[in-house]
Amino acid sequence: MHQTEARKTLKDAPVMWRRINSIGIILDCNSTYATNLGYAKSEIIGKPIFEHVPKESWEAMNDSLKTWFETGEVTDRKITFKRQDGSTFPGLLQATSLYDENKNMLGSNTVIFDLTQMTDEKITEYKKFFSEANNRLGEIKEKEYGQLDESSKSEYDGLKKMFDMLSTVDLRKLKQIQ
């Protein structure tokens, strides 16, 4: 899958990121997502999102999908995730929709915060990353956006929307959720 400059900002990001299609199949993820779940990226692509959630959390994940279909986004949704070794961790899911040039929903960009890792150091790292990513997206908008094809513009717009949403998350408050 071709990676635009906008998507490259997520490659080794400190946050877990995945892109899914409109039926919940994982189309892409970053190394942080794969590593935290204990898989190779190639083992994740093409799998349904439910493979990374224990059965007792399927209803919560289903509710999250329902909210996403109805509103185009999901914010602060606590869901338990399952690693390949069977261990679990509480995560906080944030998702924004991706649309094509005709405003048809293609899928979502999803960021998951591992709530067990919400230290002051990690929060500082996230804030720095969000700031740098927003700056990079601003550069792309200014210098490259007009030359992008429709698919790349759609990807850029989806990522910009995601980072705009993430910049409103109170990361310090996440330390208290578990």
Predicted features and spans:
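PAS/PAS-like sensory domains
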Residues: 15, 67-78
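PAS-family sensory domains
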Residues: 20, 80-86, 93-96, 99, 104-115
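Conserved hydrophobic beta-strand signature of PAS-family and PAS-like sensory domains
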Residues: 26-27
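PAS/PAS-like sensory domain cap-loop motif
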Residues: 33-44, 55, 102
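PAS/LOV and related PAS-like sensory modules
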Residues: 1-22, 122-149, 155-168
